[in-house]
């Protein structure tokens, strides 16, 4: 589950289904390549995130894969 703020921002772009698979598919439709990294426990504690999404030269830190995909989508959509 992603935060309500991200859900409302995505809805503004016409994305209303906010589960991990739907968000991943929406991101894949808009970007050619990306990398999702699940961080080990010590970097997760240090950076206070569990996932890191890399798109080009940008980086998005998140607590869940779905949140990472949502942040990436919002960055791509502007």
Annotate each predicted stretch with a short phrase.
Residues 1-63, 67, 74, 78:
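N-terminal segment of the canonical double-stranded RNA-binding domain
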């Amino acid at each position: 589950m992603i935060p309500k703020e991200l859900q409302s921002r995505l809805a503004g772009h016409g994305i209303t289904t906010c589960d991990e698979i739907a968000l991943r598919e929406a991101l894949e439709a808009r970007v050619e390549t990306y990398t999702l990294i699940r961080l080990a426990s010590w970097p997760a504690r240090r950076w206070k995130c569990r996932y890191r999404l890399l798109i080009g030269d940008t980086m998005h830190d998140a607590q869940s894969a779905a949140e990472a995909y949502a942040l990436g989508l919002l960055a791509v959509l502007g």
